[in-house]
């Protein structure tokens, strides 16, 4: 069934038909017809952000915590360009977004009109796909196609750029079922022969290792359930990338902790020494592999990924399997069960003994203090006091992000929202706005740094406006901590522009925005202050003043292999451990 509508009305109707409940945006001249159509309906609730980057990150948080497509609406020119950072972030981390942008009228495109920008050209490298809609007849198909592309295959952001005259034009609107999307149908079922070969290789392993990533989370909760079943069936150890945290429970004894530059010693050493690596939904990025030519040199590698371009891109693998993680894991579980497969118990037992020796090194250990709050301790206490609640965590980017990954134990998928690939400072606060809207009864905490959070601090006002009781837990060390750490370790402690000399009073800043501010400076006061934060049913800025000199360990020096990892007690040797080539990789 078709109905005549304006282009602006089609946009809102398409969002409603796609199940969109919340739309993050900021109005401007080139999208006023869409905002007028928005005013006339009640199906889609608009959330007015303070900056278009905030709209993109809020949509990311919404999408990552629900598995649904996140949506944003921005005007032409600076509205679209302000959203580019968030779009790039979503592309790097495989987050499904649909971004509707306004554009100058079609007859003015290319004339340097007011607030004109080549949105399609600018966003081509940072989107999964983008469109410039020149005809009203194409608009319904493109809108529905955008959701299909964003949410299938490897998820990602899609931009639909709509000139203002197309928004005013009238045409016939059709619902999603009228468009079969025959042009884009990514492969979800893995090749069965390759899956059989993978299972046979797994059964022959002496020192196996599961290496999982954000693709498991993106595949849905069933994928996480199947992963847990397969890990239990095999008895193999498992690690994860930053983006994959929560797909496997951190409390389980087979969990090795996070992998990579700031991962645990046991996970990195096991990856280096394993003989069979089962990579599921990860992409072998540089923060995971360390030096490529020394990455897990003795292992046969199985790689499961829905994106064929990710396979053999960075690391050559022996058994490539293109398919959705849930579908492939289902086949793996079935074949392991029906084939009555069993790992070599003696070899696996010896492997676990070696892993326990690495665990005994306690690579995440740090020196406690009764005088100053250690950032690791702050995260540990935050975890202990919130783990029994319905909690979602977002982060900014920096040392605090790594400490959160190391010390906050995630038991379920979709509970951890962070900027992994792009490393976007300012991601966490607006992302928490999106998460809180999606989960209004849940406890949503942004673990932040005092430098990073200032990138998008204005979005606290958004939380206040919509009565979203987000908690911003700031680890305040007075520095851009990760920058300071690298300057200390690589540049002779020459702290060039990494000290935040004019920090705001976060308590007063919170109060100025009609939120609540809390200051905590002593370890003995921390538990009580965190409990107060949790109990307050309003947005809270929690200024947790931590040790300014604390560094984030363990770490793999840039350009080094996994078995060259340095623990905190060996930090003095780090400068000599990093090669000149490695310094370029920081």
What does each model-identified segment do?
Residues 1-2, 137, 200, 205, ...:
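Phosphate/pyrophosphate-binding active-site segments
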Residues 8-20, 61-67, 91, 149-154, ...:
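Glycine-rich phosphate/diphosphate-binding loops that line cofactor/substrate pockets in enzymes
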Residues 11-12, 16, 20-21, 29, ...:
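Active-site diphosphate/adenylate-binding microenvironment
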Residues 21-25, 44-47, 65-104, 211-212, ...:
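A short, small-residue-rich loop immediately preceding and capping a beta-strand
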Residues 64, 214-302, 410-441, 454-457, ...:
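Glycine-rich, anion-gripping cofactor-binding loops and their flanking helix/strand elements
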Residues 100, 108-109, 114-115, 268, ...:
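Thiamine diphosphate
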Residues 101-142, 164, 244-353, 530:
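Glycine-rich, acidic loop regions that bind phosphate or pyrophosphate groups
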Residues 145, 149-204, 364, 567:
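Conformationally flexible catalytic loops at phosphate/diphosphate-handling active centers
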């Amino acid at each position: 069934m078709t109905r005549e509508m304006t282009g602006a009305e089609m946009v809102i109707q398409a969002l409603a038909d796609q199940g969109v409940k919340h739309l993050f945006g900021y109005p401007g001249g080139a999208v006023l017809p869409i905002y007028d159509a928005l005013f006339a309906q009640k199906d889609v609730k608009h959330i007015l952000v303070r900056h278009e980057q905030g709209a993109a990150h809020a949509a990311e948080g919404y999408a990552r915590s629900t598995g649904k497509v996140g949506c944003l609406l921005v005007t032409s020119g600076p509205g679209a360009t302000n959203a580019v950072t968030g779009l790039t972030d979503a592309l790097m981390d495989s987050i499904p977004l649909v971004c509707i942008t306004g554009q100058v009228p079609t007859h003015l495109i290319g004339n340097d009109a007011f607030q004109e920008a080549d949105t399609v050209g600018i966003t081509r490298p940072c989107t999964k796909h983008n469109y410039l809609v020149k005809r009203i007849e194409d608009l319904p198909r493109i809108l529905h196609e955008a959701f299909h592309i964003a949410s299938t295959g490897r998820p990602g952001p899609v931009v639909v750029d709509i000139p203002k005259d197309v928004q005013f034009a009238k045409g016939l609107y059709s619902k999603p079922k009228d468009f079969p999307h025959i042009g884009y149908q990514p492969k979800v079922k893995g090749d069965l022969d390759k899956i059989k070969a993978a299972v046979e290789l797994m059964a022959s392993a002496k020192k196996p290792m599961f290496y999982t990533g954000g693709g498991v989370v993106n595949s849905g909760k069933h994928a996480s359930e199947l992963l847990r079943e397969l890990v239990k069936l095999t008895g193999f150890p498992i690690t994860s990338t930053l983006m994959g945290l929560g797909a496997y429970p951190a409390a389980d004894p087979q969990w090795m902790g996070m992998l990579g530059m700031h991962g645990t010693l046991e996970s990195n050493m096991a990856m280096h020494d394993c003989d069979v690596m089962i990579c599921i939904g990860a992409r072998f990025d540089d923060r995971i592999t360390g030096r490529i030519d020394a990455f897990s040199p003795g292992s046969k590698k199985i790689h499961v990924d829905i994106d064929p371009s990710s396979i053999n891109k960075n690391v050559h693998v022996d058994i490539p399997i293109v398919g959705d993680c849930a579908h492939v894991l289902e086949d793996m579980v079935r074949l392991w069960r029906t084939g009555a497969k069993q790992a070599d118990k003696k070899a696996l037992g010896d492997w676990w003994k070696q892993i326990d020796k690495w665990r005994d090194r306690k690579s995440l250990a740090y020196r406690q203090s009764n005088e100053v709050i250690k950032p690791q301790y702050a995260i540990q206490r935050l975890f202990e006091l919130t783990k029994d609640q319905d909690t979602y965590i977002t982060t900014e980017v920096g040392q605090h992000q790594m400490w959160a990954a190391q010390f906050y134990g995630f038991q379920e998928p979709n509970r951890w929202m962070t900027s992994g690939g792009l490393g976007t400072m300012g991601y966490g606060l607006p992302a928490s706005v999106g998460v809180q809207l999606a989960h209004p009864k849940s406890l949503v905490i942004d673990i932040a740094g005092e430098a990073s959070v200032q990138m998008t601090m204005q979005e606290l006002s958004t939380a206040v406006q919509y009565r979203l009781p987000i908690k911003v837990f700031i680890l305040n060390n007075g520095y851009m901590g990760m920058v300071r750490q690298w300057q200390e370790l690589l540049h002779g402690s020459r702290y060039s522009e990494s000290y935040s000399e004019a920090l705001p009073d976060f308590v007063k800043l919170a109060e100025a925005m009609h939120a609540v501010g809390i200051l905590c400076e002593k370890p003995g006061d921390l538990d009580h202050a965190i409990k107060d934060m949790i109990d307050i049913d309003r947005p809270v800025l929690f200024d947790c003043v931590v040790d300014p000199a604390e560094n984030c360990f363990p770490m793999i020096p840039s350009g080094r292999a996994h078995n060259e990892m340095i623990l905190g007690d060996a930090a003095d040797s780090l400068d000599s451990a990093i090669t000149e080539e490695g310094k370029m990789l920081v």
